[in-house]
Structures are given as structure tokens and as C-alpha cells.
Amino acid sequence: MSVYGLQRLYIAGAHADATSGKTFDTFDPATGELLARVQQASADDVDRAVASAREGQREWAAMTAMQRSRILRRAVELLRERNDALAELEMRDTGKPIAETRAVDIVTGADVIEYYAGLATAIEGLQVPLRPESFVYTRREPLGVCAGIGAWNYPIQIACWKSAPALAAGNAMIFKPSEVTPLSALKLAEIYTEAGVPAGVFNVVQGDGSVGALLSAHPGIAKVSFTGGVETGKKVMSLAGASSLKEVTMELGGKSPLIVFDDADLDRAADIAVTANFFSAGQVCTNGTRVFVQQAVKDAFVERVLARVARIRVGKPSDSDTNFGPLASAAQLDKVLGYIDSGKAEGAKLLAGGARLVNDHFASGQYVAPTVFGDCRDDMRIVREEIFGPVMSILSFETEDEAIARANATDYGLAAGVVTENLSRAHRAIHRLEAGICWINTWGESPAEMPVGGYKQSGVGRENGITTLEHYTRIKSVQVELGRYQPVF
């Protein structure tokens, strides 16, 4: 018997049965309890979702921007009214502490929808004079039907981040959440419908990567926005391009450097490093997992980090005092433990954690102790590869040039940060770091106004910020001739 029963698809403004005959299960990562059995979409279901999205999108795009804005604002109100109930659902599905899901996941998702609701009326074209009797004007028009493919670490937030600019610009979206955390996207779909979004404008199809592939290759879809791992992102991008030259946005992985200079406030630096590695049990794509510390202050910094790690409150996600929960799945647990074993084998010095937690109520959950490695080298797997778990690698450096060169020596380029009291050094270093999101003397905040995305193999395009609206519209250029037409022949 599951907690939430059988979960279906959401197509054309209502829950709908899948035709595949297949289901998959989703579990509470803190207890192992079966949360729900979820129907998996078939190719026919994806076709049905695309057809309803096309129909709904025509109605949605025909509305005025102000009408769309008001409907999206109503969705924001509903999200905020139901914050606690949605936070509990997200807690059960992801394993995150309730204190975190109440304060972050739904709140930040609603903020992004509110932000784009305010920008819906600001989408406009240009007028360009050519001659006294001729001019050009441009229109920004919606793309049509877009697909969003989400990751398992921030299910409802990602659904909001992807759908908000798409809908604000007059598009429809078919969203596929991760099969690891599939539940909250259905609640967002219900809220959009209740707020007045036309049927079909936000559909949810459930399933594994095969469903994502169907969306990526579907000729009726104009754009794919994907959040997840690099290798999967490459496959999505390949399918999107080969099928119909779709627009793509890719928010992919990272192995982000945090550089602590010798003039830094070390208490502040330790606070930043612990947050940048252990928030959401380390399951954040922007985490600063490569912590470069200038040699002169390394020992003092490590002492402060370990003192803070010792204060982390690992516990039941439902306990309001807990600030560190389990990993999202058994597969992720195995992956993280494998990397920890690799760090030990390659000679990194284990300073904290380094094992699965199995005592008391942890035994049935996917808990790994917050782990800190010292004396790390750039060639170690724990330093080179994305772990997506609570594993911090501390490395030392001597000079600024050395730190920048080593920080940039990666295929990733999602985020980076520096901690220093020297403002000139801070900006100089940030300007040289090859990353799309950078922080100075802080870490991790991604407000709606701030574009989010990576360099190199960490992504293509951006989410959030005004610039993202450009990626959900296409430009039509129109020349108007007021005078006599001059024939060529």
C-alpha cells in the first residue's frame, strides 16, 4: 500500500491514464517507504500531450500579455497558500529536511513565476526607420510547444523555472519530471489549471529517460529545456538537433571551485564552504566541491570547517531541527559511497564522515555522513568528477595565478566563487574564472533576477533573468513601405 496511491499523467487540464501499461515506483529516501506507483507515458501519450499543447497554446497566445500575467500571478498565490502541504510532499519525495523545503523549494519556484508574470507585458519588438517612407518593425512571437525535462534534486522549483518564462512568452510546456521525484510536478499542473491556464498549456508526462528521448525527438516540439547530467544532456541535444533543429537550453553538471585567499575572513569562508558542499546533502549542481585554500591559512580554515561539520544536524526530514537529510535514491547512495572509497584509495586524507549512516532510524534510509577530504590532488577522481553528494575536497595553493589556472582546469564551468577582503583581487579573480555563475564572499543564492547557466560542458543558454525570455521567443521582421513601390523590371 502506497502513501499517495496511483499517479497518472496530466494532459489537457486533467489527470489522464497512460496507455503504456507500465508503471514505476517512487520511495521515501529517508524510510524506504513506497510513496506512489506512477504510470509511465508511451509514445502515443506523448503525441496526445503535444496535440493538446498545440491546441492550448493557440488559445494562450491569443490572450493579451496582461491576461497571461494575471493568471500566472494567481498561480503564484496558490503556490504560496499551499506552501506547507507542497513542502511536505517535496520532503517525502526528495528526502530534504522540512525546514529546507518550506523555506526554499516552493518559495523560490513561486518567486520565478511572479518575476516572469511581471515581465509578460514587457515583451516587445523594435521599430527601425529605413527611409522617410519605409521602416522595419520586429515582433517577438512564442515558439509554440516547449518541453521541459527536470532533475530529481529540485523537482517543483525546476518545473517552475522552466515553465514560467515559457508560459509568460505565450508558449505551452510539456514537462517530464525525474522518475526519482515525480510527484510535485503534478501538483503544479493542478495549480496552473485552477489559476486559469488553458487546458494543454502545461502537461506532465511521467517516465524514465525513454520518455525524455521521445520529447527531445518529437517534431511537434519547438524547444527542449533540460536539467541534469552532462552525458544525458548531450543525448538530449543530439536528438533535439537531429530531429527538427529545436532550440535547446541545457543546465548541466559542475565541479565548481571555491577559492579562499589568505586575507579572507576564515569564519565566513568556513560558513560558505560548508553551505556550498552540504546544503541539500550535497545534491546541488552548483556546489563548490573543489575548495582551494591558500597554504598560509589552510590549517586554520580546516579547523573551522570541521567544527561546523560537527554541528550539522543529520536526522529525520520531518524534524524541524534537521538540516541534513538522506540522498534521493539508493542509486545515488551507491555512487557517492563509491567516490568516497575512491578518495580513500587514491590517498586523500579523510577528515570527517566517509561512511553510510546505519544506526537507529538511519538504517532504512539513504544517509551518508557529511564527508571532508584533505590533502587532495587535482588528478583524484573526487576532485575531477561530479559526485553530487556531501563530499568536500580541500586543496592548497600558493599564488593567485596558480589557483585560477587549477580552478579552470576542468571540462565544467557552471559556478565559481572567491572569499577575500581585497575587492580588487575579488573582481580580478572572478573575471578570469571560466564559470557562468560566480559569487564573491557568498555562495548559492540564485534569485529570479539572476541568469543561471554554465560555460563549457556545464550548459547552453540560461534560466532566470530577463535574457531567458529571448530564448522562449522568435523574432519576426516586417518591412513596411508607405511610398510608391519601385519595380525592378
From Swiss-Prot:
Per the record, the pathway is: Amine and polyamine biosynthesis; betaine biosynthesis via choline pathway; betaine from betaine aldehyde: step 1/1
**Active site annotation, chain numbering:** K162, E251, C285, E463
Instruction: Kindly list the positions annotated as binding K(+) 2.
Output: L245, K456, G459
**What are the entry keywords?**
Metal-binding, NAD, NADP, Oxidation, Oxidoreductase, Potassium
EC class name: oxidoreductase
Q: Which reaction is this enzyme known to catalyze?
A: betaine aldehyde + NAD(+) + H2O = glycine betaine + NADH + 2 H(+)
- BP GO annotations: glycine betaine biosynthetic process from choline
* Amino-acid positions noted as binding NAD(+) in the UniProt annotation, renumbered to this chain: G150, A151, W152, K176, P177, S178, E179, G229, V230, E231, T232, G253, C285, E386
Q: Where is this site: Seems to be a necessary countercharge to the potassium cations?
A: E247
Q: Which PROSITE patterns match?
A: ALDEHYDE_DEHYDR_CYS, ALDEHYDE_DEHYDR_GLU
- Per the record, the domain of life is Bacteria
Report the GO molecular function annotations.
betaine-aldehyde dehydrogenase (NAD+) activity; metal ion binding
**Where are the Cysteine sulfenic acid (-SOH) residues found in this chain?**
C285
What are the EC numbers? Answer: 1.2.1.8
Q: Which Pfam families match?
A: Aldedh
Q: Which residues bind K(+) 1?
A: T26, D93, V180
Return the cofactor note field.
Answer: Binds 2 potassium ions per subunit.
CC cofactor: K(+)
What is the role of the protein in this entry? Involved in the biosynthesis of the osmoprotectant glycine betaine. Catalyzes the irreversible oxidation of betaine aldehyde to the corresponding acid.
Give the record's family classification. Answer: Belongs to the aldehyde dehydrogenase family.
Please identify the protein, giving its name as recorded: Betaine aldehyde dehydrogenase
Species source reads Burkholderia pseudomallei (strain 1710b)
Gene field = betB
